[in-house]
Amino acid sequence: CDLTFLPLHENAEYYEGCAEVLNEEWKRSLSARLHSLQKSCDTFPVSLILVEVNGSNKEVVGHSRVSIVHGREKSCLVESVVVKKNKRGMGYGRKVMTETEEFVKRKGYEWMYLTTHDKQDFYKHLGYEFCNPVISLGFNAHLLPDHILLDFFTI
């Protein structure tokens, strides 16, 4: 099989498959999940998917979401990293993270933060270190004018 890594918003045929992978780990209604996934865009936040291709069969097997970290130049936050349950232990998690790292580098980001509650050992094994929390407004960043964001993050 082949693996390909894609921005979800450029590949609308994978929205439902992506929602299923996320809902397997974090339950939400399908409509709520699709609503949030459809906010993925080039200017961030962006949902990225790992697709397994076996001939004509294509299946979403992994996901990550990247948002801008406010108040920290050239920094982004990676969250909602997940691999389909029946595909775990096959190196797909590492592949999602490696491809996500390459994606953010191409976009000009130099620092990548992530959030996790139960996978600290996995990320430590990949070379990540614990740090102080960072702030990302994710899909809501556009709701605040730049001057308010600047004031908020320079307090």
Stretches with model-predicted labels:
Residues 105-110, 117-151, 155:
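Conserved active-site alpha-helix within GNAT-family acetyltransferase domains
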Residues 67, 84, 115, 134:
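Conserved residues at the C-terminal ends of beta-strands
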Residues 1-59, 154-155:
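Short amphipathic alpha-helix that is part of the acyltransferase structural core
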Residues 83, 89-102, 125:
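Conserved acetyl-CoA-binding loop-helix of GNAT-fold acetyltransferases
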